[in-house]
A protein has these predicted regions:
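Extracellular glycan-associated modules
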Residues: 2-163
Length: 163
């Protein structure tokens, strides 16, 4: 079950105030619905992450929308981002394996960009990642695609699962 640390609890140096914890025992999720977007082609997600177990073969979902059709998740120690029910996929090369490190991820989407590599960007600890996983085709989102990541009334979720 996710643990949310309240504002009145003491910071021990190991707890992050206001943080969530997913323990991978199944079904844990936070969710809601998007409000009215200013632009449904643009989306930014930023969060801190600390890996707690070994390789994730099935995936550890960071963020999803449209009932699971569009996801950002950890898959086999790499970052994968799916659009349009997985028909558009990016799988970045950096291996996320260090269980003692905190990672800061920023996902930035702007499908109005004419250059496909500018439509979806990943930053890890302040560095833009441009290398994709070897042997995996890059399928960037189409230009001007309005994804489920910023659509009024669409559900979104933050969760984890073990595959």
């Amino acid at each position: 079950m996710p643990t949310i640390i309240g504002a009145n609890q003491l910071d021990t140096g190991y707890d992050v105030e206001g943080a969530c914890r997913f323990d991978n025992t199944g079904g844990d999720a936070l969710g809601g619905t998007f409000g009215t977007p200013t632009n449904a082609k643009k989306f930014t997600l930023s969060f801190w992450y600390k890996k707690s177990s070994g390789t994730t073969s099935g995936g550890q979902v960071f963020f999803g929308a449209r009932s699971g059709n569009e996801n950002i998740f950890l898959h086999e120690d790499t970052i994968r981002w799916d659009w349009q029910n997985g028909s558009k996929t990016l799988n970045w090369a950096p291996l996320i394996r260090d269980q003692s490190a905190w990672y800061h991820f920023v996902f930035a989407q702007d499908t109005s960009q004419s250059t496909n590599t500018n439509r979806a960007k990943l930053y890890v600890n302040g560095t833009q990642i441009t290398t994709l996983r070897s042997g995996v085709n890059a399928n960037y989102p189409d230009q001007n695609l309005e994804t489920g990541y910023n659509v009024n009334g669409q559900p979104f979720f933050v969760s984890s699962y073990n595959g």
